[in-house]
Regions:
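Conserved active-site alpha-helix within GNAT-family acetyltransferase domains
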Residues: 97, 122-140
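Conserved acetyl-CoA pyrophosphate-binding loop and the N-cap/start of the following alpha-helix
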Residues: 90, 94-103
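Conserved GNAT acetyl-CoA-binding A-motif
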Residues: 109-119
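Acetyl-CoA-dependent GNAT
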Residues: 8, 16-89, 110, 142-143, ...
Length: 159
């Protein structure tokens, strides 16, 4: 997989993505402000081995959920907050593990990341199962915009 700074073309595509219920909270609005965030340098596009754009990763504060920030859950040194999204047509097709592991490997190399943290809606059992299978551990649960989220953390084994 190829992971690279998100291009404007990829950002435009992401900004049209809509997901079916109950995953629609991950849908994009198409607003100009969203484009500005997608192109602020913290987002990375991911293409499969055929060169097709399949999803994105973001690292840092943009991967944090507002309710978790309000609850002061994002402290700590050396923790890389991680967000990701896969093209809606590709979700639930068994590609998530390879996709997400590619993002972890990229952040490890690019940022020397050792500890990863993500926020996931608790109803999203597909994602929670994937993250647990990779080695993420469940952390605190919090509310954000009326929905329940969970922090999960993963410490990369030393080489």
């Amino acid at each position: 997989m190829d992971i690279h700074k998100l291009t404007e073309e990829e950002a435009n595509e992401i900004n049209t993505w809509t997901y079916e219920e109950p995953y629609n909270l991950y849908s994009f609005s198409g607003e100009k402000e969203v484009m500005e965030e997608l192109l602020d340098g913290t987002y990375y596009g991911c293409c499969d081995d055929q060169g097709d754009f399949i999803g994105y990763f973001c690292f840092g504060a943009n991967a944090q959920v507002p309710g978790g920030r309000d609850a002061h859950l994002y402290g700590g040194e050396g923790v890389t907050d991680t967000g990701l999204g896969m093209k809606p047509a590709l979700t639930g097709k068994g590609m998530g593990k390879e996709f997400f592991q590619a993002g972890i490997a990229f952040a490890t190399k690019e940022f020397n990341a050792k500890m990863f943290r993500l926020s996931v809606a608790t109803f999203n059992t597909r994602a929670v199962t994937l993250y647990k299978n990779i080695g993420f551990k469940q952390g605190p649960i919090f509310l954000s915009r009326g929905r329940e989220f969970m922090l999960m953390e993963y410490e990369r084994p030393s080489a």
